[in-house]
Amino acid sequence: MEFSTQSSASLHQIKTSALAIGVFTNQVLTPAADIIDRASNGAIRKVLKSEFSAKSGSHLVLRNLEGIKAERIVLVGLGDQDKYQAAQHKTAESTFAHYCIQAKLSEAVSTLAGVDCNGTTLRQRSSGAAQAVLAASYRFDATLSTKAEAIKLSKYLQWVPRTLVSESKAGLDEGTAIGKGVNFTRLLADLPPNICTPTYLAEQAKQLGKTYP
């Protein structure tokens, strides 16, 4: 999985399979959602009024919006703006990642880390984003006769203003390292005890030491 930033184009001009924008309950738009709404002649506000409550963990896919180059706009519910914290942000990123995986997309762009939330920095939110995506992509098939279908999602871009690229990139790098570590731990935990023996764990530890000296 490749994580990187996108800052070279206006949101409505980004060509991507899916662009995630966050919206709060009570029809409150994030700055990114407002940009897309203006570029699409109010399409986002119309949907919020009629069919999307924006509860945390929910999403709605809009296709072929006028004035928008992204194939899909994925509205991601953030819940109540006053209660939006790191946990809700991670849920939002996970919701979008699961959608992209289920839709078998190869790449996607998210604006979710750019949404301010209480007690966090952009770096922390970027780290949380990478962790959420890697967690969503975890599959265990090491001991199964039928292997899990390969995840097609290989590139996850985070849209941020140019002035914030370095902070975002640092967070993505941090989150990638943590996410890979968590997934490796999950793999070990999922292995049967006749395979994941103390000797096997010691061998894995030695290999990690060689890979990450």
Task: Indicate where each model-derived feature is located.
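Short amphipathic alpha-helical segment within the helicase RecA-like ATPase core
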Residues: 1-213
